[in-house]
Amino acid sequence: MRLGGPWAWLLGLPTAVVYGSLALFVSVLHNVFLLYYVDTFVSVYKIDKAAFWVGETVFLLWNSLNDPLFGWLSDRQFLSSQPRSGAGLSSRAVVLARVRALGWHGPLLALSFLAFWVPWAPAGLQFLLCLCLYDGFLTLVDLHHHALLADLALSAHDRTHLNFYCSLFSAAGSLSVFASYAFWNKEDFSSFRAFCLALATGSGLGFVGAARLLRRRVEAAGREPGCPAMAVNDGLCEEELLVGGEEAGSITLGQYLQQLARHRNFLWFVGMDLVQVFHCHFNSNFFPLFLEHLLSDHISLSTGSFLLGISYVAPHLNNLYFLPLCRRWGVYAVVRGLFLLKLGLSLLMLLAGPDHPGLLCLFIASNRVFTEGTCKLLTLVVTDLVDEDLVLNHRKQAASALLFGMVALVTKPGQTFAPLLGTWLLCFYTGHDLFQQHPPAPVGSAQPWPEPPAPPPAQAPPLRQGCFYLLVLVPIACALLQLFTWSQFTLHGRRLHMVKAQRQSLSRAQTLDVKMV
């Protein structure tokens, strides 16, 4: 009876809460990983410089390829539009398969996270293996989690409801960044290891528990009429035929890529999202540099650390306000408004100049918060593209994970372009090469190796001016490009309603076919 009470309470949680909690179990690990993995291998394990760059290069290639690879392996059976013979799968069975995958891959993600903080191999080899293992399991978790957003719900209202809880739990998970400051000590690493062990244990158990709850909810939805157990999708009540096997009706990777090349809205979206990913990582890479050269004389070190920490939490809290707006006005209108806001704030900052510390501080923080927040909203747009892809190509089932993987394949180069283009622009404008001096290190991180001393003070004014123009002109250029590409995107308004209606009618038609057979 003692166990029955809490378990009964957990079973009574809404599906959206259980789904959103998965974002918590990822966020508590990933934010700590981003903040400390370089410092750990450089300052604690003393990794060799050549081994560090070899590991980062291999990681860059693996990080770019694993999204479409795992998406293809997961969803290739869903691509055929031709009827085939074989064992049937229902829409509910697809969701159950994704939930089971999360139940396995989530704990493995937690184990791969733990592998960073205990030396168990030569530093270079451990660095390479840990990065590839961690990113592989993180990709699997992200793909199936995002795919569930498209599979559990069809209407925009229900999807924003699910995304609302993802933002709420992601904000809670970001608090692990603040807690980590109390345990981080390069001289005595044992307390930080214990902290990471506690995070990994909680995350792994959370994945197992959440996957079990979701599985019971989906299974109950198939047994009970009207789907009372599922709060967000009536479609899971239906037994939609999805046949397996590798018969002649299957689609090859080349044919799928041709279909994507004809998917006009997909092409415009990934063009816009490439710029968005670039801008997000540009802000992350140069946030400490802007604080150092534009605000170091006006704010304390603790204030700068607080701004850095709050920038991890604020985008998720910000989305709690924007998601209700998405329900009312649509994601397209809200994203367009955010692009206009980015352009307007950047133009105002350009006109004001670099001599207003308060305004600069507000702009640097808001620029990062709004940009990161926009990235979170774009997940909803990808789910709409999943619907349109299913309708345009008459698929038997939505290839959700595969489409998310293809979006990541096209947009991830923005992560690489951000630091390269930013440092090149700064060097071109000011003659200042960041690699020729010790750049300011973010809180909780460190640059791998000491560099020669900074240039003489006479170069400081041009560098400060260069940082300011980089800060305001990059958002202006990004906003203009995004407003143009977003204006070409037509999956909103009447067209979006038509796609939703056609997907619902396809689902009902498939259900009738199965019942007639």
From Swiss-Prot:
Keyword Zinc: no
GO CC, one annotated term: plasma membrane
Record keywords, A-Z: Cell membrane, Membrane, Transmembrane, Transmembrane helix
Intracellular or extracellular location(s): Cell membrane
Keyword Transmembrane: yes
Cytoplasmic side: 44-55, 119-126, 180-191, 293-305, 351-358, 430-466
Coiled-coil region list: none
Disulfide topology: none
Major localization listed first in the record, in broad terms: membrane
Name of this protein: Transmembrane protein 180
Organism encoding this protein: Bos taurus (Bovine)
